[in-house]
Design a protein with these regions (language model features):
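Internal hydrophobic scaffold segments of catalytic domains
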Residues: 1-6, 76-92, 97-99
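Conserved active-site "lid/cap" helical segment
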Residues: 1-3, 7-8, 66-70
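Active-site-proximal gating segment of KS-fold condensing enzymes and close homologs
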Residues: 3-53, 97-117
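Acidic, glycine-rich active-site loops and adjacent beta-strand->loop/helix elements
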Residues: 3-5, 59-63, 87-92, 166-171
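Domain-wide signal for the mature, well-folded portions of proteins, strongly enriched
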Residues: 24-25, 33, 90, 124-127, ...
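Active-site-proximal alpha-helical scaffold in enzymes
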Residues: 36, 40, 44-47, 54-89, ...
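Active-site-adjacent elements of ketosynthase-type condensing enzymes
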Residues: 65, 90-126, 169-175
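Condensing-enzyme catalytic core mediating Claisen C-C bond formation in acyl metabolism
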Residues: 114-176
């Protein structure tokens, strides 16, 4: 489990970077809370007490999918019988928004209107993976999956919601 950007608010990296400028001290929690693997590390150490593997593969907006693929491969190979895969991302802080805006990476009303050839933006069409787009829409999300090999799920009487046989992650090509 991991996030691509880590915790950037005042409790994490954002607070650590701004503390001295604001006349505050850096807390002992800001650096660890700013690590992109802290959600998994925290749950592993403080909730589950697990001695199993923890780690992450970060890949921008596909971070969850990269980690899901690793878990599926571990279960299919027999290295693991159960895996918890997750991601939580909350990058809506002014510095991140300004950073993406400076890169012209965000979909704006002006760019949406130009792309659609209209005078008013249709925000429902702002996110268009693998298609013509004018940037992306910054958002927050969180999801966690518990994966088990077939026999373990049946032995435990687990309620099975889906099967993940493979995971495909593809980039969406050249950007304009």
């Amino acid at each position: 489990a991991a996030s691509a950007m880590a915790q950037l608010d005042s409790n994490g990296t954002g607070g650590m970077l701004q503390a001295r400028l604001r006349g505050n001290r850096v807390s002992s929690k800001q650096l660890p809370l700013g690590l992109n693997t802290m959600p998994a590390d925290f749950i592993n150490a403080y909730v589950l007490g697990s001695v199993g593997a923890t780690g992450a593969n970060a890949g921008a907006c596909a971070t969850f999918l990269y980690n899901l693929r690793l878990a599926v491969e571990d279960i299919q190979s027999g290295r693991r019988r159960v895996a918890v895969v997750g991601n939580a991302e909350a990058p809506l802080v002014p510095e991140v928004i300004e950073g993406y805006a400076a890169m012209s990476a965000l979909a704006t009303d002006e760019k949406l209107c130009r792309l659609d050839g209209s005078s008013s933006p249709d925000h429902r069409r702002a996110s268009r993976p693998f298609g013509d787009n004018c940037g992306f829409t910054l958002g927050e999300s969180g999801q966690y999956f518990v994966l088990m090999d077939d026999s373990l799920a049946l032995d435990l009487g687990a309620q099975i919601h889906a099967a993940v046989t493979d995971v495909f992650v593809n980039a969406d090509g050249f950007k304009k």
